[in-house]
């Protein structure tokens, strides 16, 4: 593993998009290592799951909250989310995963005589995806802080189908960041 490198600035240096991206990558990597190695992964606050709806249209509701995924990404949920669930099954995990979403398209400078300039995103939004998974892999970290095995996400609950309806499994231990 190579030690992290940050940009060295000096007067007269020409900065490129690659340099600015490297600067962002350095600080994001540092923040994510900090989150992963000092706090672990899991729910920090909120993100409680409840089963709502009836037997013909069941759904789960996740309340606002904050989590850190196994890679150190911060996941912020600002408003309640409702996700439909199948009418029957055996068990499901409710999992939240970090996602980056390119946004705010702007034209790319090109030939002024060219009427249709290419558009590229000027921002990247830190968002998330809420998933239902029949199986959820266990995660483990090696001594160097690398995460191995399975998809990156935070399981918020396990749902069990019992007596013709979904219920939150109270025995399931939600991982907690500290």
Kindly give the residue locations of the regions a language model identified.
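Beta-strand-rich solenoidal segments
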Residues: 1-9, 59-178
């Amino acid at each position: 593993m190579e030690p992290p490198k940050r940009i060295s600035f000096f007067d007269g240096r020409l900065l490129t998009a690659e340099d600015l991206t490297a600067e962002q990558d350095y600080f994001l990597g540092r923040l994510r290592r900090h989150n992963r190695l000092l706090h672990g992964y899991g729910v920090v606050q909120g993100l409680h799951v409840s089963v709502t709806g009836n037997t013909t249209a069941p759904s789960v509701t996740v309340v606002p909250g904050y989590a850190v995924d196994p890679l150190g990404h911060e996941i912020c949920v600002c408003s309640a989310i409702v996700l439909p669930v199948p009418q029957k099954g055996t068990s499901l995990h409710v999992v939240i995963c970090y996602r980056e979403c390119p946004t705010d398209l702007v034209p790319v400078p090109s030939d002024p005589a060219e009427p249709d300039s290419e558009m590229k995103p000027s921002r990247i939004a830190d968002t998330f995806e809420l998933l239902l998974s029949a199986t959820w892999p266990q995660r483990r970290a090696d001594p160097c802080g690398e995460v191995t095995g399975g998809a990156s996400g935070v399981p918020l609950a396990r749902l069990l189908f019992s007596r013709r309806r979904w219920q939150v499994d109270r025995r399931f231990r939600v991982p907690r960041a500290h």
